[in-house]
Design a protein with these regions (language model features):
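Short, solvent-exposed loop/turn segments at secondary-structure boundaries
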Residues: 15-18, 142-144, 175-179
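Residue-level signal for short, function-critical loop segments
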Residues: 10-11, 90, 136-138, 168
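Hydrophobic alpha-helical membrane-association signature
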Residues: 22-26, 146, 184
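N-terminal beta1-alpha1-beta2 submodule of the flavodoxin-like/Rossmannoid cofactor-binding fold
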Residues: 1-88, 93-104, 108, 189-204
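Flexible, glycine-rich phosphate/dinucleotide-binding loops
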Residues: 13, 48, 139, 171-173
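Short, glycine-/small-residue-rich phosphate/pyrophosphate-handling segment
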Residues: 116-159
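Structural beta-sheet core signal
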Residues: 6, 86, 130-132, 164
């Protein structure tokens, strides 16, 4: 059974978040075509503690001793997922802090990556792709640094493909918001169909 990890950083919640609408369109399309997929929904508003130096040392100790502390859950989820879907609004050229906190806990030596003998980082995640869904009040204009970061981090974890669907310009006066969201939703649904129908033959 395929495991789909949905990291929900739609901090305004389902009622107000425009990013949430894109996420739902993607997930509905994907699970319709791939009904055997097990969706793990992580609401990142239920925030983890900030990873301080002391907590990082504790985490390294848990891993070294083979302990299963709940705060290792983010790393284990990323490592065991077959598909990672991230929903986050475009804030300050990036994404909300709750997502960064989760990702810092995910970056765990021995779980999501390791070092080879020559010092290279080797990813340990089995995920075949990462999907980033976002919405922005203005134009992104090539400054989608949140996606750039996620793509690089995913590669470090061994995730070979990354895709982004963005609804842009939603707060610009005169914008037909519903039309923009509908077009972005169509792109999200098309990507979901691609990933559901060609799980082992991705191009990206």
């Amino acid at each position: 059974m395929e495991r789909l990890l949905f990291l929900d950083a739609c901090v305004r919640g389902p009622e107000l978040s425009r990013t949430w609408r894109l996420c739902q369109r993607f997930l509905e399309e994907y699970t319709t075509l791939h009904p055997q997929a097990q969706v793990c929904h992580r609401d990142l508003r239920e925030s983890l503690p900030i990873l301080t130096g002391e907590l990082a040392r504790q985490r390294d100790g848990w891993i070294a001793r083979g302990e299963d502390d709940p705060r290792l859950t983010p790393a284990r989820e990323i490592a065991s997922a077959d598909l990672v879907v991230v929903g986050a609004p475009y804030w300050d050229l990036s994404f909300p802090a709750v997502l960064k906190v989760y990702l810092e806990w995910s970056s765990a030596l021995g779980i999501t990556f390791r070092y080879a003998e020559d010092g290279r980082q080797v990813g340990l995640s089995q995920a075949r792709a990462l999907v980033y869904l976002t919405s922005a009040g203005g134009p992104v204009e090539g400054q989608n640094y949140g996606f750039d970061y996620l793509k690089a981090l995913g590669a470090m974890f061994g995730i070979p493909h990354a895709y982004c669907v963005a609804a842009e310009g939603l707060d610009i006066q005169g914008t037909n918001v519903q039309a923009v969201l509908r077009r972005a939703g169509d792109r999200a649904a098309a990507l979901a169909r691609q990933l559901a129908q060609e799980p082992m033959c991705l191009q990206g």
